From Swiss-Prot:
The lineage of its organism: Eukaryota, Viridiplantae, Streptophyta, Embryophyta, Tracheophyta. This is Disease resistance protein RPH8A. SUPFAM superfamilies: L domain-like (SSF52058), P-loop containing nucleoside triphosphate hydrolases (SSF52540). It comes from the Eukaryota. The gene is RPH8A. Keywords: ATP-binding, Coiled coil, Hypersensitive response, Nucleotide-binding, Plant defense, Repeat. ATP binds at G192, M193, G194, G195, I196, G197, K198, T199. Disease resistance protein. Resistance proteins guard the plant against pathogens that contain an appropriate avirulence protein via an indirect interaction with this avirulence protein. That triggers a defense system including the hypersensitive response, which restricts the pathogen growth. In contrast to RPP8, it does not specifically recognize the Emco5 avirulence protein from Hyaloperonospora parasitica. Residues 15-57 form a coiled coil.
Amino acid sequence: MAEGFVSFGLEKLWDLLSRESERLQGIDEQLDGLKRQLRSLQSLLKDADAKKHGSDRVRNFLEDVKDLVFDAEDIIESYVLNKLRGEGKGVKKHVRRLARFLTDRHKVASDIEGITKRISEVIGEMQSFGIQQIIDGGRSLSLQERQRVQREIRQTYPDSSESDLVGVEQSVTELVCHLVENDVHQVVSIAGMGGIGKTTLARQVFHHDLVRRHFDGFAWVCVSQQFTQKHVWQRILQELQPHDGEILQMDEYTIQGKLFQLLETGRYLVVLDDVWKKEDWDRIKAVFPRKRGWKMLLTSRNEGVGIHADPTCLTFRASILNPEESWKLCERIVFPRRDETEVRLDEEMEAMGKEMVTHCGGLPLAVKALGGLLANKHTVPEWKRVSDNIGSQIVGGSCLDDNSLNSVYRILSLSYEDLPTHLKHCFLHLAHYPEDSKIYTQDLFNYWAAEGIYDGSTIQDSGEYYLEELVRRNLVIADNRYLISEFKIKNCQMHDMMREVCLSKAKEENFLQIIKDPTCTSTINAQSPSRSRRLSIHSGKAFHILGHKRNAKVRSLIVSRFEEDFWIRSASVFHNLTLLRVLDLSWVKFEGGKLPCSIGGLIHLRYLRLYGAVVSHLPSTMRNLKLLLYLNLSVHNEDLIHVPNVLKEMIELRYLSIPVKMDDKTKLELGDLVNLEYLYGFSTQHTSVTDLLRMTKLRNLTVSLSERYNFKTLSSSLRELRNLETLYVLFSRKTYMVDHMGEFVLDHFIHLKELGLVVRMSKIPDQHQFPPHLVHIFLFYCGMEEDPMPILEKLHHLKSVQLRYKAFVGRRMVCSKDGFTQLCALDISKQSELEDWIVEEGSMPCLRTLTIHDCEKLKELPDGLKYITSLKELKIEGMKREWKEKLVPGGEDYYKVQHIPDVQFINCDQ
């Protein structure tokens, strides 16, 4: 494995030497010597990797080599970047630049000679130890070849909803009955070891038709080992009142009072997933009243947690799969599209498969991981190699004991070992994130690019390919996954046991350090600080270590959000972190609101994230960050922030998020950022709309227009952005009450799938003015006087429509027969003038979810909903009590919704 990491590093180093050959002229002799030693080194790696398991000495050799490759890359890139920074005009600058150039060239030549000598010494030691040269004529797949293969295997995605049901059908039925029909138990607990399927079982119950009809509202919160009381309460309240935008600003006591009152008056189901200790419940319980309106479904590895929460608790012990169920689940993952009519699996392979699943101990997680591993193997010899790898080190069984648990971890480890090197890198980078973190994929893809896993020009596509492969192998869990082209994986997570494997492998490869408490020496010094080039900080108490000299070689620093405040008070905090490629300071508070000027010294940075950070002033030294691919400036600032006009120098940027609130002095020139793919917060108050003309690679754009502009100007500036997939247009508060839709023409954007308009318009544009393949449309504050539905229902690719905040100010709205042929989701919120809504039979035949929120004058639910048999979920929020009384069983309008499995009433008691 280490050989793969070293080879990966060598490949990046060769690319750097080739790419910067012109700027490296003058040190040819030193570089030639380095290249000779690198070639010799590469020929030793395969034999070293084969021998590393039996020798600590060989493992140390490989660690030394990895450090040397990193050091060489740092030296060469620093030289190139300093040379770029020195380029300028004027005689004095030229003289100073020449003197500095000669000094730098002498230093880099000396440094390269030093690295070359160290490599030569390691090679000599390796050869003396008996490591042989192996000249490998093969080659690794190029990025394009990997993507081609990935496109082929994407068609065989397993149906997780189907596979998850293996062996749990009866358990789901029993749990549903206890929650819906039995009032004796306030708390129902699912207990069992990690990986046994507690969360899967709870999820099936949570979404069951009878459960969705029985309760008024639902909340799902993952508690995990490290949590904060406020965060758990906040999440519950957000799920029960999803449209309350003030929850994030509430203090702990306000949340507690509001949540207590809510649970006291309604019939709600709250799922607390992964509660570890009795004490965890004691920290959470204050919001749950004694009155029996709510019910709780709780999952835990500790059977005593549920009984501690409620002495009358019903404890359900999750059971392992039997051998037949294990093989059935494995088959569904290995052959997701095989049906009864197809040729049976080779008998020898089936026999091996059934033998291998016995080593999974009946744990669904291990069975899925094994299935993901075997899905890439198509011959008897390949299956036999997997079987031998499992059987050679463990002896499994069908019951859970220490031995079979070892076999489970062995199978999970084999799934990792089977990954190609680039995917091993992707997987290990997930170790940065705290337990049960929701990982946003757009940030993750840019993070992978900043770490050099793939070329910066293909960030989104490459990231999607790699993540889908990790999901397909059941190493990562994808949330909101849809197997249709217009949807993307929005976020992902890791199962606890898989995360343990990830952390173990990261430690084994000296890949990163996780720092939870700097007073704990074992946390910091578990490995040599000089070799830990990635730090992940999970505690605000760890501040003082950031600028320590022993971290001078750190390349990645990620600060995770935690309960206590994290302050940066030292202006020199970045002085000893000059080799950073990745820096995530989300939610960090900077003293005086100033980002330290020393950040300008981080010239290697590719990724800088300040999301939610308390910052009101950015330094002009940021102009030095010329290699940035990703820059997120979505800071949390109550005051206006000043952004110096330095972003124009970051021409490598692919992702840019600009602060929403900037002072009037901020004027930005962004026209040279031609590599941008994602641009958020673009405002014509601070930037010229014509800057967009050359950004032809843009895929996602959010633009705010001031009173100086109209749609004609905007359309002209967007005309070349033919790769746009998502576009949001907002007019400033001063001007959105003026009709600007006369020149609205977006029909030439053939790739545009998502459109959001916060624009005043008396009527919606004609259907021919819209993009031809539009899938999602969001209309806010439009003030349309004419019914938009006759136009929208003719956009035949639409799958979701949101009308919010007086998008329509008329009284009557009609969805006609044969309209909205593909619509899946409809949200009608805060349409304060709407009185009558007609849905004709044959309209919206594919609708699955419908939300009606705070439409105070709407008289009743449309009668035509009774014809929409596809409807699975109806959310009614903030409507009068009469609505609820009419629509519950026995109510006069119940016939309209009796076919809908999940009908929720939220805040409908006024």
